[in-house]
Curated annotation (Swiss-Prot):
Gene Ontology cellular component list: cytosol
Disease cited in the entry: In colorectal cancers, CRACD gene is observed to be often the target of inactivating mutations. In the absence of genetic mutations, expression levels tend to be down-regulated.
Keyword Cytoplasm part of the UniProt annotation: yes
UniProt feature, compositional bias: Acidic residues: 363-376, 397-407
Biased composition annotated in UniProt, kind: Basic residues: 157-176
Protein name: Capping protein-inhibiting regulator of actin dynamics
Low complexity composition-biased segments: 876-889, 956-967, 1127-1139
Annotated source species: Homo sapiens
Length: 1233
């Protein structure tokens, strides 16, 4: 009861003592908290054991002055002790509070009583805590005052009022009346002193011991009565003390106020009196201090008088000063105004002069133009020549107004001769390039200059020359010529292709260019400089649900050497995303530090206009190029980002060439892209490009794909983003075509990485990739090879510009045309991805990097790589594939291949032997997509029939990548037949390809699973989830690794997935980052973190391999049982998504070599589908301004499952375990079956 009484007293009694206590507590709760803790501990001991240990009293209380109670502990009744303790505590607090209360406004006489009541609740927390902490929860007697209250609530006050309403009122009265007993304060204070000297711990035992006893309601009442009596006495004392304190405080406050007031007044007076009177004021300060000291004395009135006088003086002085200051300010203002007026007059005069000068200049220019026109009219011998060189002449004639008509004619003849020479040279070069095509690409990395002129460029140039005329050829005769013509080209572009021939003439002719032309050049240069200037670019990564995963992702570009070589530079732009791609090119590539744009979540990019992206590295990453400004005049140029980056010309060329030449080239590229678009690209592709990306994107894409590619022969851009629409044309044929294109592109990018390998090898490579299946693929791939991209499984979300794909260039003209269409669809589309719906025209980031809309394509020199990998199927041609693959998104796989040579070799082999496997594996998503996308499109045979399966087995490789986006919605569920037949065919194929690498077969299985999952992937989340699950299955370890890897850098996850599914990892890089990271990883010059990640992945792979082997053993058994069930199930339960995606995936997966475990794959696939369905919807980076196509949107949500969306943060071990458990549980039903 003592404790209870104490708490009530402190809380509810509003006497001075309580008030002072509470104010003190409010002012120093830290000390109270410490004391409370100690008190609680001791009380808990005493109460729990019911022992009276004289030492139980907390030191806390000892400080409070409880030592004085020691004498009474055993002499007095527990109630008395308790009340004494309460009194002592309150007194001690009052004592301690005297000083602070005197300072605090709370104790002012007016507010004292109110403040006391208000503040009082602060203290209760302490005693009540003691009691509640004591831990004795006695049987509660509601009639009695609550014994232990955990918190301050109304219950105590209610009980108090109910039990002793009168006494409480009396206590209030006492407080008012009992202001006399000031002497009690001394006694109270003396107790604390004794307490400090005494043994602080003896009171409490009795104090707390009383609490257990109050179970008796009667005893409790007695104690309460006694307590209340003592409380009243205590209240009286406290009130008296409070009154005393108030008086003292009032006096002190009054004195302080007086002093302050006097000082202020004196200061004012001193200010008024001025500096001269300051000495007397100082003299007065002594009396002031004396007055302050004797403020309480009667002499205070005199001080006030003096202060008044001083104040008056100070005020007068202040008035004088103010007047003076005002006068000075007015003078200053006048002077300033005069100065301003003078400046204005001068400016006006200058402006007038400038205007006059401008008028004169304009008049002179007009005269010059008139003269030029006259000369032109005279010189117009051959109208054609005049048309071609009309503008050049004007510039030259302006410069040489006095030149005669003969000179003008001579100039025209010179120009014609120069143009004809340039054209001849260009044609010769093209012929040479044609001859060197097979060799050229192999030599490409070594000879950037040749690369520029390699077949793709030659083809483009020829086509463009045929279409756009010889001027383009003249413009692009060579890097040197381009540079020479660069300054004039921007103008030429603006003026038209006809004037293309003029720039060289003008350069030679005009020592000083026309002012207009100079202005234009300066503008272009500025634009180029701006674009080439590496600038950090920041973007936000957000999940589909407006949740900002990364408020700021910084892209800081590393500026590449401008002179590294056009090809190198173009490759660099692409490499920035898949930096590994650049291993082929020794030249320093400009790789942004954040080559991985997608932070593990999705593409992080704010939806920005392409024009907003200034960083060349960024642009190259995004596939934007300098072209922007060049294209701007063209109208398509504004989109510049995708194509240019691809071409890399934006990045590399501008650096290599003068900015103006770069811009001119970009413009020409756009023009050529348009021409090529119309002529080269399939009508579908061109239409698609035009319709979907919009004219800008199409020209941009083509420009980039072709023009830039020409500029920059196959670049090692590993990843390209393909708009889903391009991947999956609206029609199945288009889809298949695109899939083939995509695949060919993937394969080509494989080539691209090792562009050196002949561009033509890609078709062979395609065949090699397909091996058996690839042959059917081969036919397709030739068309597709041009684009040479791979879809990273989930990287489609990754915004990666595909550089002009060397494979595209490499591809034979047939391929080039076919693939050019597909390329236009793929390559151009990739730049266009921004415009996937044609909506994106404006922003590269505008691309909703969602699996649905874009698939990231891993570009590989598939021909060379595949050939090599065929040769070294087990080795995986880590050398060729390693660097190129490393360069390519697969590069990671190759890295993996290097690390796991067999495992990777298989993945590589998959990449290559089943080039589609690689494509499909790498774009496991693409693979799943191809299958999932439209059953027919995935395979060249669009029929979902077993036929298709067979074709799929052969073709799926190519198809898978093409379908990588897997718009399963588009693809009708692959026919169960195809599913059924495919798995076996695929198994055979996968076994063939997979045999070289048993571990890859596991990955293949995983890939198969992933592809199976991905078939659901059309419900994008499933695919991603599938990937995750694959990763989870493959290595729950990988889970942590993989999610963290995405966070760390998709490399780990991608590699881990690679280890598990050698190919899939790339695709698996569910975070667009994965693909880029893979590429980075693969890059020969890997950052430390990449190598470390690879090492970790090796460990993961090994563990996963063992786990997967076990899993496969189990699953193989289950698969045999369930294979039939699975086929039916996948057809039935999978229904559209499973059968469609599943069958497609299976067909793709089988080609991937993952089919060997057909039943197992199906089981896993089913499990993953189930999981995917259960998994949260995807996280998407909503960067794009344009909305993805409806089906794409559906996929988008699914594509990025939240786990993938969260890739940014690594998965904690517990999360991986949880996922593992979830998977195990999800597998139970199948196991039971």
């Amino acid at each position: 009861m003592g404790t209870r009484a104490f708490s009530h007293d402190s809380i509810f009694i509003p006497d001075g003592g309580a008030e002072s206590e509470q104010t003190v507590q409010a002012m120093s709760q830290d000390n109270i908290l410490g004391k409370v803790k100690t008190l609680q501990q001791q009380l808990g001991k005493n109460i729990k054991f019911g022992q009276r240990s004289p030492n139980a009293i907390p030191m806390n209380k000892a400080n409070s002055g409880e030592a004085s109670l020691e004498e009474d502990l055993f002499l007095t009744s527990p109630m008395e002790i308790v009340t004494q303790q309460d009194i002592v505590l309150s007194d001690a607090e009052n004592k301690s509070s005297d000083t602070p209360s005197s300072l605090s406004p709370l104790n002012l006489p007016g507010a004292g009583s109110e403040m006391e009541e208000k503040v009082a609740p602060v203290k209760p927390s302490r005693p009540k805590r003691h009691f509640s902490s004591a831990g004795t929860i006695e049987s509660v007697n509601l009639d009695a005052i609550p014994l232990a209250i955990a918190r301050l609530d109304n219950s105590a006050a209610k009980h108090k009022l109910a039990v002793k309403p009168k006494k409480q009122r009396v206590s209030k009265k006492h407080r008012r009346l009992a202001q006399d007993p000031q002497h009690e304060q001394g006694g109270l204070e003396s107790r604390p002193c004794l307490d400090q000297n005494g043994h602080p711990g003896e009171d409490k035992p009795t104090w707390h011991e009383e609490e257990p006893n109050p179970l008796d309601s009667e005893e409790e009442r007695r104690r309460q009565e006694d307590y209340w009596r003592e409380l009243e006495a205590k209240c009286k004392r406290q009130k008296a003390e409070a009154a005393e304190k108030r008086r003292l405080e009032e006096q002190r406050l009054q004195a302080l106020e007086r002093r302050l007031w006097e000082e202020n007044r004196r200061q004012e007076l001193l200010e008024e009196e001025g500096e001269g009177q300051e000495p007397p004021l100082e003299a007065e300060r002594a009396p002031r201090e004396e007055q302050q000291r004797s403020l309480e004395a009667p002499g205070w009135e005199d001080a006030e008088r003096r202060e008044r006088e001083e104040r008056e003086r100070l005020e007068a002085e202040e008035e004088r000063r103010r007047l003076q200051a005002q006068a000075q300010a007015e003078e200053r203002r006048r002077l300033e105004e005069d100065a301003r007026l003078e400046e204005r007059r001068r400016q006006e005069e200058e402006e007038g002069r400038c205007a006059e000068e401008l008028k004169r200049q304009e008049e002179e220019e007009a005269e010059g133009w008139e003269e030029l026109e006259q000369q032109e009219a005279e010189v117009q011998g051959p109208p054609e020549a005049l048309e071609e060189t009309g503008e050049g002449r004007r510039g030259a004639e302006e410069e040489d107004l006095g030149e005669e008509e003969e000179e003008g004619q001579a100039h025209l003849e010179d120009w014609r001769g120069q143009l004809s020479e340039l054209l001849n040279d260009f044609e010769e070069r093209l012929e040479d390039q044609e001859r060197l095509k097979p060799e050229g690409q192999r030599e490409h990395s070594e000879e950037p200059g040749i690369c520029e002129e390699q077949n793709p460029e030659a083809e483009r140039r020829r086509e463009q020359q045929g279409r756009s005329g010889d001027f383009q050829g003249a413009d692009r005769p060579g890097p040197e010529e381009k540079r020479e013509e660069g300054d004039t080209e921007p103008l030429l572009k603006q003026e038209g292709p006809v004037e293309a021939a003029q720039p060289p003439v003008e350069r030679k002719e005009a020592a000083a260019l026309e002012q207009g032309r100079k202005v234009e050049e300066l503008r272009w240069q500025e634009v180029d400089e701006r674009q080439t200037m590496p600038r950090p670019y920041t973007f936000q990564v957000s999940s589909g649900g407006k949740q900002i995963l990364f408020p700021k992702v910084n892209l800081s570009p590393v500026t590449p050497a401008k002179d590294t070589g056009l090809t190198a530079a173009p490759q660099e732009p692409k490499a920035p995303k898949a930096s590994p791609v650049q291993h082929a090119l020794p030249s320093s590539l400009s790789v942004p530090h954040t080559a991985i744009l997608v932070t593990g979540a999705q593409l992080c990019g704010p939806a920005v206009n392409l024009s907003q992206i200034k960083d060349t590295a960024c642009k190259s990453l995004l596939g934007l190029e300098e072209k922007k400004h060049a294209e701007a005049p063209a109208g398509e140029n504004p989109p510049r980002g995708p194509g240019d980056a691809r071409a890399g010309s934006g990045k590399a060329k501008p650096r290599q060439e003068s900015p103006s030449s770069a811009s001119a080239l970009a413009e020409w590229a756009s023009i050529r892209s348009r021409i090529l678009k119309n002529a080269e690209s399939d009508p579908r592709s061109s239409e698609r490009d035009q319709l979907r990306p919009g004219d800008e994107s199409t020209p941009r894409g083509r420009c980039d794909s072709r023009g830039n590619q020409r500029k920059t022969p196959p670049v090692n851009a590993k990843f390209s983003i393909m708009p889903a629409w391009q991947k999956f044309s609206d029609g199945g044929t288009e889809t298949s075509k695109q899939s083939t294109e995509a695949e060919s592109i993937r394969k080509r990018p494989m080539l691209g990485p090792s562009e050196e390998t002949a561009p033509q090898p890609p078709p062979a490579g395609v065949r090699e990739l397909g091996k058996g299946p690839e042959k059917s693929e081969m036919h397709r791939e030739p068309a597709d090879t041009t684009e040479g991209c791979k879809f990273a499984k989930d990287l489609p979300s990754f915004l990666v510009p595909s550089l002009p794909y060397p494979p595209q260039k490499v591809v034979a003209h047939t391929e080039f045309t076919t693939s050019s269409d597909s390329e236009t669809a793929n390559g151009i589309a990739k730049p266009d991805p921004v415009m996937p719906g044609g909506e994106e025209k404006a922003s590269p980031f505008g691309i909703k990097l969602r699996r649905t809309n874009y698939s990231l394509r891993f570009n590989c020199d598939q021909q060379a790589e595949q050939k090599k990998k065929k040769r070294h199927s087990s080795t995986g041609d880590s050398a060729d594939a390693g660097p190129p693959a490393a360069g390519s998104a697969r590069g990671e796989k190759e890295m993996e291949g290097v690390a796991l040579k067999h495992g990777p070799s298989l993945p590589q082999e998959r990449k290559q032997a089943p080039s589609t496997r690689r494509d499909s594996a790498e774009p496991s998503s693409s693979r799943s997509v191809p299958v999932a996308h439209p059953g027919p499109p995935p395979a060249s045979s669009q029929t979902p029939a077993p036929e298709h399966d067979k074709a799929a087995n052969k073709m799926p490789l190519a198809q898978k990548p093409a379908l990588a986006p897997k718009p399963t919605s588009q693809t009708p569920p692959a026919s169960p037949l195809s599913k059924l037949s495919r798995p076996y065919l695929v198994e055979l194929l996968s076994r063939r390809a997979g045999r070289p690498d048993p571990e890859p077969s596991e990955p293949s299985k995983e890939d198969q699973e992933s592809s199976d999952r991905r078939p659901p992937s059309p419900p994008g989340p499933e695919e991603r989830k599938g990937q995750k699950r694959d990763e989870e299955e493959e290595a729950t370890e990988r889970k942590p690794a993989s999610p963290p890897l995405p966070a760390t850098q998709q490399e780990k996850p991608s590699q881990t997935p690679e280890a598990g599914r050698k190919e899939k990892p790339m695709l698996q890089s569910r975070h667009s980052l994965d693909g880029s990271k893979l590429t980075e990883k693969v890059e020969t010059a890997q950052p430390l973190w990449i190598t470390l990640a690879l090492q970790k992945q090796k460990g993961f792979r090994e563990q996963q391999a063992t786990r997967e082997e076990r899993k496969q053993a189990r699953e193989a058994k289950q698969a045999e049982k369930l294979s039939k069930e699975n086929v039916s199930v996948s057809v039935q339960p999978g229904s559209s998504s499973v059968s469609r995606a599943g069958s497609l995936h299976k067909s793709t997966a089988l080609p991937e070599e993952k089919r060997p475990e057909t039943a197992v794959s199906r089981l896993e696939r089913r499990e993953q589908l189930k999981k995917a369905n259960t998994l949260p919807t995807s996280v998407t980076v909503e960067i794009s301004d344009s909305a993805p196509p409806a089906p794409l949107v559906k996929e988008v949500t699914k594509r990025f499952s939240t786990p993938d969306a969260a890739p940014v943060s690594t998965e904690p071990a517990w999360l991986a375990l949880a996922k593992r458990k979830a998977k195990a549980w999800s597998d139970c039903p199948q196991i039971i079956k």
